[in-house]
Amino acid sequence: MEVLKLCLLLTRKKQFEVELIPEKIGARRPWKLETSSTATEAVVSVVTYLEATSGNARDAKEAGIYIRVYGAGWMIPEFVRMLMLHYSKHGECILQEIGAAFRGEHATDLLLICDGKETVRAHKLVLAAASPLIRMILEETPVLDGVTTVYFPEVQVSYFRLLLDFLYSGQVYVRSVEEYHHLQDLLALLQIKASIWKNSDGSDAGEPRKSEPLVDINRNTEGITGSSVVHQHPSRRRRSKSQDSLSGDSASGGGGTGSQAGTPKKVSVKSERHSAGSSVDGDGDRDREENLEYLDEVEEAIIKSNNNHPLHPHQHHLVAGSGGHHLHHHHHHHHRQLHQISRHDGDDDAGGGSGNDGASEGGSGESGRAGSVAGESAGDRPTPTNLSSGGGGAGSGRRSGSGEPTEPAEDDEDYELDVEDRGGDGDEAAGEGETRSRRSDPSANRRRSSSDPVNLSIVKQQQDVDSDDANIDVETIGTATTKTLLPPRYLDPFRTKRKAAAYYIHPADAEALKPMDHEGLLHNSPDNYVVTPHRKRRPGFHNSPAQNPPFVPSYLDDLRARSKCFLSAPPTYLPEKYLSVLTRWNLKTHLRVHTGEKPFACRLCVAMFKQKAHLLKHLCSVHRNIINAPEAGGRYTCCFCSLVFETLQELVRHLSGHHNNLLLSKNLHE
């Protein structure tokens, strides 16, 4: 007789389909027997079929196609194969449904009345499964209607809600050890087994360990069945790579004048990130994190937009050739400046808080830092130096209320000297006494009047060895040497960190290379700038050149005197065709620090900026409610036209290209 195999399939309609397939292919056609009743009838049908085909039931039994389902029939294991239907996420789905029913109070059949007649609704099945006391009450109490009421007159409703959260979700956060002890007493009252919420070694979970103040509710150890209660909410903070670097910068050198690094700063993106990173309070922390993520997105979009559509296209070409090293150096510092676009060039106290200057960072209260070395790359100095002094000697004093102490340097290479002008006639003792009074009285540090122009120059005299570089005032700058005022990299523009071999060039290329003319570039700049203090609000001030001669730094003579390189070989210079474009643009941008010129203006407020990237960052952060309104559905809307963009980078590229004229302050009244 042919050996037949039986396949029993369970469908959603609970019907059994029996398929008999001969072992030998082609010996007999498959037979399908269907039934909509029970498995017993299916077995009977199979037996009937086998008796009809083989002649008796004994041969059918020997063939091994009898099965037994819930006691109906026989089963021979070596011939019968059972199929199993596995529900992979059964427990997870059940917990989700039970939790949703508890939160929405759906199909609740248990009413708990606590102290103060406050009620809590729950489900009998969940509480009876965990609490023997609730199970006993439900078994002994006749159910008159669908809802059973249980009174707990001495239990506060807040503790019962914590207990229900623990029973429904398997974990709960408590605010203090006292709450934990109350919850522990409630668990004991309901006769809930200690193995559910205690460790197996019998240690008291209510006493937190000093080395482990946070206990995870889902932590499983050896011999533990269940979970433990957490007594303190863990603080979760996410800090991006840019946030870590910014917080490090602000902690190292971003402090206010005459104070420690922990002093609160003026309004700036850096200080906001640093303060938001240390906040751990609920919804406020989440809002700050969302704002920080948005600001990171804005900064990244502006950087990508500048990389795709650079303000200076020539910088993408000036990498190869004999001057490639120096060009890479300029490009590196220009890229570092793009990362510093959090320093706004607006005003500290502009209306609506929208005109925040990056120069106001550090807590000094001034509208901006002025000064640096002419011809220095603008990207090489993210925090320019302000050197302002008169023609007086070392013993000359300064005007009352016109100066501020020096801020500490942000890095090892950048010296930030913020010293105002001083009168030509004065006594040395009076100047020292006034300086001491200014150090003792912080309220005397006020912003210098913007109506008096200032000539910037560098005073080079002898300085004592014991002078403190971190607290340079009028007296110390009057006696300071050139080495203290200017780092060596200013006096030697060809100093690099490469090997000495980089300074040697082929003799055939010496004729094509030519040193740059610093003085010629300065006097032949597009505008003969007049050096004045930083201005407020809108530009438009003009001073007479006779009253204010152009800024000519005195270190140019030292540059000419030190023209010879420290090596015997001639120094390597950039070709003039590169310097004529690259250096002049950097010089023009840098001179805005001294002149106070802000060619970029915001049309939505009174803020003005020295660079376009600062204005774009201002539009995307301060006026976020306009470009990223809630009704826009997460998309970005142009504030000058009705175009809508999917990403922030597309909007920044659109503003920088199509509406470039609207960003200029000279077209403000058009």
UniProtKB/Swiss-Prot annotation:
Residues 351-368, 389-400 have a biased composition (Gly residues). A zinc finger (C2H2-type) spans 586-594, 600-623, 636-658. One of its GO terms (biological process) is female analia development. It comes from the Eukaryota. Residues 218-230, 451-464 have a biased composition (Polar residues). Residues 407-419 have a biased composition (Acidic residues). It holds the Pfam family BTB. Residues 108-176 form the BTB domain. One of its GO terms (cellular component) is nucleus. Residues 200-288, 307-470 are annotated as: Disordered. It is found in: Nucleus. Disulfide bonds: none annotated. Keywords: Developmental protein, DNA-binding, Metal-binding, Nucleus, Repeat, Repressor, Transcription, Transcription regulation, Zinc, Zinc-finger. PROSITE patterns: BTB, ZINC_FINGER_C2H2_1, ZINC_FINGER_C2H2_2. Residues 325-338 have a biased composition (Basic residues). One of its GO terms (molecular function) is zinc ion binding. InterPro entries: BTB/POZ_dom, Dev/Hematopoietic_TF, SKP1/BTB/POZ_sf, Znf_C2H2_sf, Znf_C2H2_type. Transcription factor required for terminalia development. Negative regulator of the JAK/STAT pathway: represses JAK/STAT-dependent expression of ventral veins lacking (vvl) in the posterior spiracles. This is Transcription factor Ken 2. It comes from Culex quinquefasciatus (Southern house mosquito).
